[in-house]
Structures are given as C-alpha cells and as structure tokens.
UniProtKB/Swiss-Prot annotation:
NCBIfam families membership: kdpA
GO MF term (any one): potassium ion binding
Keywords: Cell inner membrane, Cell membrane, Ion transport, Membrane, Potassium, Potassium transport, Transmembrane, Transmembrane helix, Transport
Species annotation: Nitratidesulfovibrio vulgaris (strain DP4) (Desulfovibrio vulgaris)
Name of encoding gene: kdpA
UniProt name for this protein: Potassium-transporting ATPase potassium-binding subunit
Membrane topology: Multi-pass membrane protein
Family membership noted in the UniProt record: Belongs to the KdpA family.
Taxonomic lineage from the root: Bacteria, Pseudomonadati, Thermodesulfobacteriota, Desulfovibrionia, Desulfovibrionales
Length: 569
C-alpha cells in the first residue's frame, strides 16, 4: 500500500471516531430518553401532530411482546402498501416513461426487500420502476425500515439499562423519533451536499445527448440525490440506477464516495456510544467500537491486497504485474472500490461502487465473510448494534464457563433464557443461506439463472442467499434472479433474516429488563479492555464466520486454486 491509501483509511476512521460519540449522545437524548434537543423547536410540533393524528400515546410503555407485535403490524401494513404501489404503478401518477406494473413475484420480492432494509433488486431501477414507486413505495421504506431497526436497538438498550421493569419503551414513539430527529435531518443535509457534488435531482425522465461517436443516447435521470442520501444513511443500498453507486450521476466524485461511506457507517457506529451512555460505561463502548474498527481494517486491507495481486493469467499475458481493475471505476481506483465494498458488506447496506462479481476469488471471499459474520462490523442501522449485543452475551457466557464464574453482563446475570434466544437467533440466521443455496444448486431453476459454471456459479448462489438473509442486498451480478422461484425464495430468506433475529433480541431485552443489576465487583468479567475485545473478536469469527466454512470451501476457495492453476469455466 502507498501512503495515499493509508491516509484515506486513517481519514475515514478518524472522521468516524470524531463524529460518532457526538451523534450517539444525540440519539440517546432524542430517541432513547425522548428529551428535548435543539431540533425540537422545529420538529417538536410535527412530532406531536403525528401522535395526535395516529392516536399514539408516547408515554404508554409496552412489554417486549407488545413491542414486537407493533413492529410486525407496522411491517405488514408497509408491505401491503408497497406491493400495491408496484403492481399498480402503470395506473399511478409520476410515470413519465409509462412503465407497466411489476409481476406479482417481482413486486413481492421488492416489497419484502425494502421492508426488511435489504434492498435486493432483481430489476434495473431506471427501466422498471416509476418516479412515484421510487418516491412513495421505496424511498418511504428507506426511512421506516431503518427507523424500525433503530427502534429495536433502542429497546434492547433499555432492556439492558432498566431494572425490574416489565416494559422496554413504545415502538411507535421510537419509530417517529428515529425518523424525525435522526434520519430526516441528516439525509436532507446530505442530499443537498450530494447535489453540489453532481448527483442529479429532477422529476424529468431524462435527456437525450449527442455522443462523441456522433450518435444519440438517452440518459435516464430522476429524483436521485434524495434517495441516495437515505439509502446510504439508512444502510438500505438500493440504487436509483442499476449500476448503483458506480453510476456517475449517483456517485460522481471521490468526495461523494467518501461522504457516502461515512453515511453508511455513521449511525451504526454512533449507536455503540448510545449504548455506552445508556449503561453508563463508555469504556465498554470504546472497546466494542475498536473491535468493529479492527475487523473493518482487516477486511479492507485483505480485499485491497487480493485485488492488487490480480490474476495470474492476465499477468502472464501482459508480462508484467496486472491489478484487477475489471468492474471498477477509474475515478475510485482499487483502494476506493475495496474500501467501499468492505463498508457496504460490513454494514448490511448493499450499495456498490464496483461490481462484486468481478472481484478476484479471495476478494469475493472477503465480502462474503463480512456478511456471514452476522453484519455486526458496525452493521445496519440498529441491526448492527443488537446483533453485536448477541455476540457480547455469548462472549460473556463463554468467559464465565471458562473461569467457573456465573456469567453476568453489566451487573445482570446471564441465564439459560438469554443464551437460548441468542443461539436461536444465530441458528435462524445461519440456516437459510446454506439450505436455500443447496436447493438452488441442484435445481433446474437455480442452475438456469447462472451465467457462470463451476465454483464461481456456486459462489453467486451462496452470495445471493447470504446477502438476503443478512439483509445486505448486494449481489454477484452474474445471477439472473428475476424468476418466480428466485424472487420467492430470496424474499423468504430476507424475512427470516430480519425477523428471526429481531424478535429473539426483543425477547432478550424483555428478560434483561426484568432483572435487578448487582454491583459489579472483582469477580465480574470485565467488558472493556484488551482481553474482552480479543475474546469478542474470536467469538464473532469462530461462531459467525466458521459456520459457513464448508460452503466457502466449495465456492471462492476452490475458485482461487483453480485460478492459480489457470483453469477457466
């Protein structure tokens, strides 16, 4: 690596470390505790109006079961609305291109995808979805799916911080505050900045331009900047254009690239410090943050190294070392593409500024492992935090078993119920990618979708279902997934991955809230410092990533050795 690459990585992490504690404290005040902030003078009346119009009583607290029921009811209503909008878009306004309604299976897949914060796209946005569908059906979910994840994370924090309580907050109040005080203001500012960088924002269908060859080309446009801002900030990832953040009208400059990466990580990173504030343990927050940052750096440097080594066949033909620039934008280069790919697969975002299908086998392996570790390396908005709490509980439990102490976390005893729910969430998240991948690999509909045979074809299948279950949404684009079987199975994978982890973690929150914290003494396992950080890292890697080792051996690992031997499919 050159000095410039080290500088970019240091600048990114430095800005993240400076901004995250500030935003984390703000989220603690505005969402976790519902206190007055400097935004309340403007948005407070809007919040109260929403409560009155919706019949919400923000002071009414809910048990974890009531909280979960509200979450599921809200999600079901949002799914039905978006499904209807997509099916009927040819009869709705703001459709200057005259796009027809989507097929039932594509509408089902897309509605589930945006509902679950996955944003998997089996279609090209600029040639399939109308402006109305983008703004009302999809951009709406970019806000509320992220807000739902943030609300669940806040509920988990309350469960850890409360003592002898039967409630964990109010889902509706948490949802409204998350949108009004966190997502909406930041995305508004970011959208304006992105417009200044050259991201388009118009209601026009597009424009026709003369090319250098003397011909004419129609360039699709639309309300892009507003959707890009929230798709990054909410770790959604679904692009306005099919090329996503590689498109010059969606991510035109190196500065816009940096801002979009910061937007992806900023809320998940900040929530770590909100947790520290909630439980009055900032050292614990910094330890968890450094674990995330170290895993992120390892992923970025590994991916960068794999791409700079290139492929032996091209090196042999060129008679000189050739880096792998296939599928990458020259304006970002290998390091800018590698860091973005690591950010987006760490954070369950799924936006891409380079084609992951064109990565080297080891480069693709890094992106797969990032997701398979549970999307806890900062992770999605909310989901990264409560996913990390899951691994923290397992770490504390295992540490207690090793030293013969009763495991406790923040003064509260970890009992069989919490461990059972945590393991249930892990098993639920790990099973669908392996099961669906196995079925697709031996089925006619699965093989028919492949453009590549052999190990890389299997990697495409495994990547798709891993991305779906982990609510990431990125893809190895050589897979033609727009068919009834693919759309339905991927939608099921997304639903299982989203609610199969959310609901058990709400159960953990309810169980922990009912306990009384004991004074933390010398016999309590410390949840800060090097020892805890190392043990947490090992648990994430062993429990999270090694679950998939046999499948990875059949995909990118085999493909890497075939590449070294000069084998092609």
């Amino acid at each position: 690596m050159q000095l410039m690459e080290y500088t970019q990585l240091a600048l990114f992490l430095g800005l993240l470390a400076l901004m995250s504690p500030v935003l984390g404290r703000f989220i603690g005040r505005a969402v976790l505790r519902g206190e007055q902030t400097w935004l309340h003078s403007v948005l407070g009346p809007v919040e109260r109006l929403i409560y009155r119009a919706s019949g919400i009583r923000p002071e009414a607290r809910q048990s974890w079961r009531q909280y979960a029921a509200s979450l599921c009811a809200f999600s079901a209503a949002g799914f039905l609305m978006t499904f209807g909008v997509l099916m009927l878009q040819d009869k709705l306004p703001l459709n200057p291109q005259g796009f027809p309604g989507l097929s039932w299976h594509l509408a089902f897949n897309t509605a589930v995808s945006f509902l679950t914060n996955t944003n998997w796209q089996s279609y090209a946005g600029e040639s399939t979805v109308s402006h109305f569908s983008q703004l009302v059906g999809l951009a709406y979910h970019n806000f509320v799916s992220a807000a739902a994840g943030l609300a669940v994370a806040v509920a988990v924090m309350r469960g850890l911080a409360s003592q002898e309580s039967k409630t964990i907050g109010n889902f509706w109040a948490d949802l409204v505050r998350s949108v009004l005080y966190v997502l909406l203001p930041i995305s508004l500012v970011l959208a304006v900045v992105l417009v200044g960088q050259g991201v388009v924002q118009t209601m026009s269908a597009g424009t026709e331009v003369a090319t250098l060859e003397g011909g004419h080309q129609f360039i699709a446009m639309g309300p892009t900047a507003s959707q890009v801002a929230i798709k990054m900030l909410g770790t959604n990832g679904g692009g306005f254009f099919n090329a996503n953040a590689a498109h010059p009208l969606e991510n035109p400059t190196a500065l816009s690239n940096l801002l979009q990466m910061l937007a992806i990580f900023i809320i998940p990173s900040s929530l770590v410090f909100t947790l520290g504030e909630a439980v009055s343990n900032r050292r614990h927050a910094w330890t968890v943050w450094f674990v995330m940052a170290c895993l992120f750096m390892v992923g970025t440097l590994s991916l960068y190294k794999a791409e700079t080594l290139g492929t032996p066949l091209l090196t042999e033909v060129a008679q000189a070392p050739v880096t792998n620039m296939e599928g990458k934008e020259v304006r970002f280069g290998i390091f800018g593409s590698a860091m973005f790919a690591t950010v987006t697969t760490d954070a369950s975002c799924g936006a891409v500024n380079a084609m992951h299908d064109s990565l080297t086998p080891l480069g693709g392996l890094v992106t797969l492992v990032n997701m398979q570790m549970g999307e806890v390396i900062f992770g999605g908005v909310g989901s990264g935090l409560y996913g990390m709490v899951l691994f923290i509980l397992l770490t504390v439990f295992l540490a207690g078993l090793m030293v013969g102490r009763t495991p406790d976390y923040l003064g509260k005893r970890i009992e069989g119920r919490e461990v059972t729910l945590a393991m249930l969430a892990l098993i639920i998240a790990a099973t669908p990618p392996l099961l669906f991948s196995a079925v697709a690999a031996v089925s006619g509909w699965g093989q028919a979708a492949l453009n590549n045979a052999g190990a890389h074809g299997f990697s495409e299948i495994l990547y798709a279902y891993t991305s779906g279950v982990q609510n990431n949404g990125s893809a190895f684009a050589g897979l033609n997934a727009n068919s009834p079987a693919w759309n339905v199975t991927l939608a099921l994978a997304m639903l299982i991955g989203r609610f199969g982890v959310m609901l058990p973690m709400l159960g953990v929150a309810g169980s922990m809230a009912s306990r009384k914290a004991r004074p933390i003494g010398e016999f309590s396992f410390p949840v800060s410092g090097f020892t805890f950080g190392l043990l947490l890292t090992l648990v994430i890697v062993i429990v999270g990533a090694l679950t998939y080792l046999p499948a990875l051996a059949l995909g990118p690992v085999v493909e890497h050795f075939q590449m070294l031997d000069g084998l092609l499919h």
